[in-house]
């Protein structure tokens, strides 16, 4: 049975709209929480930020490669696959929930979508393309739409060293970045 959607909010929008930042800020406003992120390096980056705000003894990092779990941790920053299922927390967030559609990892994101709930608040972040499914599964949930704050554009092939500040490099293979 799908968990009730009375405390579930979806934040949908394109990349670079502040969805993850919003979830982090919401989590640290509670006494405890769990956030599931799609990438190990992103989990590490968020962990480092939460440690500054809440302290090393209160913050755990759980990924497939790293486990830093202080005995009294209250905030758990994880890859989605590594999110603990035995912890009752006030807040839960899952980032990039549209990965429910992913062939390899979709079952994990779908499980979190259907069953992961915070006692007070549950946030699911993702792109707009998941909205039709959300509306069918969670007809009473709140959906917040975010718009991109800055322009994203393709500037063609450039030397890595000649990129303007705040540029993003998108590649499907590491070797493509070096080429």
Where are these regions (language model features)?
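Post-DEXD/H (motif II) to motif III coupling segment of the RecA-like Helicase ATP-binding lobe
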Residues: 33, 91, 98-159, 166
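Conserved strand-helix element at the start of the C-terminal RecA-like helicase core
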Residues: 31-46, 122-125, 163-179
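Residues at the beta-strand->loop junction immediately N-terminal to the Walker
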Residues: 12-13, 24, 170
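Walker A (P-loop) phosphate-binding loop of P-loop NTPases
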Residues: 16
């Amino acid at each position: 049975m799908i968990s009730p959607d009375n405390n579930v909010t979806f934040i949908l929008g394109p990349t670079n709209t502040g969805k993850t930042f919003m979830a982090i800020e919401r989590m640290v406003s509670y006494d405890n929480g769990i956030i599931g992120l799609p990438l190990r390096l992103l989990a590490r980056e968020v962990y480092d930020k939460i440690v500054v705000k809440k302290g090393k003894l209160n913050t755990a990092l759980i990924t497939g490669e790293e486990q830093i779990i202080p005995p009294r941790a209250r905030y758990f920053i994880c890859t989605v696959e590594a999110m603990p299922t035995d912890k009752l927390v006030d807040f839960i967030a899952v980032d990039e929930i549209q990965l429910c559609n992913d062939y390899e990892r979709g079952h994990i994101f779908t499980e979190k979508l259907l069953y992961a709930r915070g006692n007070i608040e549950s946030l699911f972040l993702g792109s707009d393309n998941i909205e039709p499914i959300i509306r069918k599964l969670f007809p009473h949930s709140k959906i917040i739409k975010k718009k991109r704050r800055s322009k994203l554009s393709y500037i063609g092939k450039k030397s890595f060293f000649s990129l303007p500040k705040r540029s993003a490099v998108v590649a499907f293979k590491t070797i493509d970045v070096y080429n």
